[in-house]
């Protein structure tokens, strides 16, 4: 341990202020870290640690953060900042680092000399990460020494000590394994972490963040570094849209220690996206910074339109909605002592932020318009179009309000309503086509279920202005049926007539297209329905299976496989090489285990043949520890297993160790050498580790060839994939299989039994976890620009299964 001398302004041990108590964290973790079941709290653990590194960058002491998901499920975060103070904390009698790790509300962010602004303190700090982890290892590089400490369950098990010299290196590394006592699972999602880390890289220009996932055989690495900051962020958000400006408008300024940074870019769409951040923390519900931005934007554009004569020429006034149509904006403020409406920090309520944002925006944006008159006119012209469209939409809406009794009767002829008037007890099915609508109308529960047939494909609202959308008959019928109205000023979710809105389309390409059109409509025009959990997608069955007089409906391929397995196991017996027989429920368990192994093997890169991976798993090639002890012995066993399953003239496999501690398998076949290699990194990957957990079971069942006996049929079984294939083939014998492509193929009673009956059906609730990513996806799929859509299809084509309709 090193004693430290510090000046009053220095970041040292005495900078750490303490507010005690950790037991409450373990008792009610959700209050401190978020939901412990849906994954958000688990990933928030990582963000807490990452934010400490980012705060070092904000203070000017770091420029690199590394996040690594290790193959054992733990995660490490390191930075090249100053390193957590290691001196003895005067008030606590232990190192400052241990105080930070074991005391709630302990850290340098309470001390204004250490950090002027910080985003990492979500009311908790890294001590909560420690409290909710099986173990946490801390390494600190400071004062030329490497320090190490270990904690378990939030308690110190190895006090901070010097373990090595480190030269000039400085920084901190935290590695932790989340506790299964707190979290229902501890599987980190690479994409979820990448999204948040990308935001941080954009918001902190010049900071390099590297995310590595060591779990797959081929490690995933994402390097996130953006010199352009929020300007690059806006370009990234608009990557699938067509901008009307050559470059984003960029504004930066400071007032009363509040730093305001804004990037704005208008595109040719009709949708607004403004992402507000305070000290790198996103505000889903906006706040005072958003209010200041909107007020300044509307005022500045109106002033420019007046002074340039555009407003007088066009004879129309602009609103804030007009100014923000097609706008993509990132608004980032750095505030010394921000105040939020809740622990989740979803809304900024610091009153001093609004005038700061408003003044900086007014001044800087006015200057920009004066200095760039040609581009300013492009922006104002776009806003003029929006204002004219708004006026046209108002007139169209007035016409809608003046609907006569005949119009309402026309809707009644389309909508087959239910008798229940309590919206919380009712549901409306949006059904593709009149024929399916007829079956649904006859088969439904008339008390609580309404049916609205949709004729043809509804309007693609991604490519249509609001006034044109209001002129669409199908959309008009839908809006009238729901009862909420439409548009920012008219929509009222309290008037929703059905609390379950169920999209029910065919299982073919047209059905998928109609479903996507409807999802686009709800996402763009009625997002509150998705946010409140009112939107669902029906899951009509994909198959009807008949055997004799019995009929079974199966909703998807997984249900089909389960059914075929049950049928194939019935009356079957697996006779092992030692003469023992497995049947009934025991055989079903063996087959299910084979299915689980197949899913693990399918996660390996496709260039590894599945039968070789299967035999390697049986031979024990993926068992941790055993492989390192006798790798050549394992290689010989794998070669012997491959000879076992080969025809006599195709044998001769030989195994040897490769330089990267993998296995090279080779044989001479018809004078040509065939080589297969199990790479060392692959054999130590997360997939290999999972495969190794099956080895004992595999050796118990498949160590010698077995036979599957069913009635008078006998099949040789050399491994779990053989068994799975044989059982599914047995299950298919004597079955008549019908694959439904349209709802109209089912009669009313079938539709009720499979899709409408609340006690038997399956519904998928529509949720949006990432608004920006969802916006980009809808733009790609439904927008005017072809190239991003082509790229999306090319990138995802290989992931499509069952493309047979």
Segments predicted by a language model, with ranges:
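Conserved phosphate-chemistry cores used by DNA topoisomerases
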Residues: 1-805
């Amino acid at each position: 341990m090193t004693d430290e001398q510090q000046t009053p302004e220095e970041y040292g041990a005495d900078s750490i202020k303490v507010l005690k108590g950790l037991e409450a964290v373990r008792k009610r973790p959700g209050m401190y870290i978020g939901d412990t079941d849906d994954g958000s709290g688990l990933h928030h653990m990582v963000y807490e640690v990452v934010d400490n590194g980012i705060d070092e960058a904000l203070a000017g002491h770091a420029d690199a953060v590394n996040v690594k998901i290790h193959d054992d499920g733990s995660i490490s975060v390191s930075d090249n900042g100053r390193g957590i103070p290691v001196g003895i904390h005067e008030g606590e009698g232990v190192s400052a680092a241990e105080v930070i790790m074991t005391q709630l509300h302990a850290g340098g962010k309470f001390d204004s000399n250490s950090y002027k602004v910080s985003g990492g303190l979500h009311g908790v700090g890294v001590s909560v990460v420690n409290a909710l982890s099986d173990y946490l290892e801390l390494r600190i590089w400071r004062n030329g020494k490497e320090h190490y400490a270990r904690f378990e369950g939030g308690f110190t098990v190895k006090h901070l000590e010097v373990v090595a010299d480190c030269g000039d290196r400085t920084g901190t590394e935290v590695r932790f394994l989340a506790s299964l006592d707190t979290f229902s699972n501890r599987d980190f999602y690479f994409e979820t972490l990448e999204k948040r880390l990308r935001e941080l890289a954009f918001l902190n220009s010049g900071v390099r963040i590297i995310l590595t996932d060591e779990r797959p055989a081929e490690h995933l690495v994402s390097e996130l570094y953006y010199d352009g900051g929020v300007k690059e962020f806006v370009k990234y958000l608009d990557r699938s849209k067509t901008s009307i400006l050559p470059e984003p408008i960029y504004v930066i300024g400071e007032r009363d220690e509040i730093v305001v940074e804004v990037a704005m870019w208008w595109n040719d769409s009709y949708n607004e996206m403004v992402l507000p951040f305070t000290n790198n923390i996103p505000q889903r519900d906006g706040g005072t910074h958003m209010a200041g931005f909107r007020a300044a934007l509307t005022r500045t554009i109106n002033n420019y339109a007046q002074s340039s004569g555009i407003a007088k020429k066009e004879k129309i006034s602009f609103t804030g909605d007009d100014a923000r149509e097609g706008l993509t904006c990132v608004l980032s403020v750095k505030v010394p002592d921000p105040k939020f409406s809740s622990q989740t920090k979803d809304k900024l309520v610091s009153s001093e932020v609004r005038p700061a944002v408003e003044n900086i925006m007014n001044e800087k944006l006015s200057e920009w318009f004066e200095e760039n008159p040609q581009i300013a006119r492009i922006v104002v012209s776009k806003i003029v179009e929006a204002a004219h469209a708004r006026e046209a939409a108002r007139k169209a809406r007035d016409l809608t309000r003046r609907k006569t009794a005949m119009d309402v009767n026309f809707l009644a002829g389309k909508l087959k309503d239910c008798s229940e008037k309590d919206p919380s007890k009712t549901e409306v099915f949006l059904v593709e086509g009149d024929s399916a609508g007829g079956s649904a109308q006859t088969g439904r529960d008339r008390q609580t279920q309404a049916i609205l047939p949709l004729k043809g494909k509804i309007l693609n609202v991604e490519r249509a202005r609001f006034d044109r959308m209001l002129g669409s008959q199908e959309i008009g019928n839908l809006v009238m049926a729901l009862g909420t109205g439409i548009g920012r000023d008219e929509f009222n979710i309290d008037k929703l007539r059905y609390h379950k809105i169920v999209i029910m389309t065919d299982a073919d390409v047209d059905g998928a297209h109609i479903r996507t059109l409807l999802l686009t409509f709800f996402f763009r025009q009625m997002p509150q329905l998705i946010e409140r959990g009112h939107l669902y997608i029906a899951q009509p069955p994909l198959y009807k299976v008949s055997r004799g007089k019995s009929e079974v409906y199966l909703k998807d391929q997984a249900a089909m496989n389960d059914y075929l397995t049950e049928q194939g196991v019935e009356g079957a017996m697996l006779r092992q090489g030692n003469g023992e027989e497995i049947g009934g429920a025991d055989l079903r368990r063996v087959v299910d285990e084979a299915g689980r192994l197949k899913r693990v093997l399918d996660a390996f890169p496709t260039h590894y043949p599945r039968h070789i991976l299967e035999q390697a798993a049986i031979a024990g090639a993926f068992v941790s520890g055993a492989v390192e002890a006798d790798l050549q012995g394992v290689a010989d066993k794998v070669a012997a297993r491959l000879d076992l399953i080969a025809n006599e003239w195709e044998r001769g496999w030989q195994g040897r160790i490769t330089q990267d501690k993998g296995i090279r398998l080779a044989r001479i076949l018809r004078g040509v050498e065939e080589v297969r290699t199990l790479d060392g990194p692959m054999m130590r990957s997360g997939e290999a580790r999972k495969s190794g957990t099956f080895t004992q079971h595999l050796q118990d069942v498949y160590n010698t060839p077995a036979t599957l006996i069913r009635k008078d049929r006998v099949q040789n079984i050399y491994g779990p994939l053989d068994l799975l294939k044989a059982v599914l083939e047995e299950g298919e014998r004597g079955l008549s299989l019908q694959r439904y492509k349209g709802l109209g193929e089912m009669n009313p009673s079938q539709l009720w039994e499979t899709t409408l009956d609340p006690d038997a059906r399956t519904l998928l609730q529509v949720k949006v976890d990432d608004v920006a990513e969802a916006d980009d996806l809808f733009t790609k799929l439904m927008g005017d620009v072809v190239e991003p859509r082509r790229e999306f299809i090319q990138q995802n084509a290989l992931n499509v299964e069952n493309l047979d309709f």
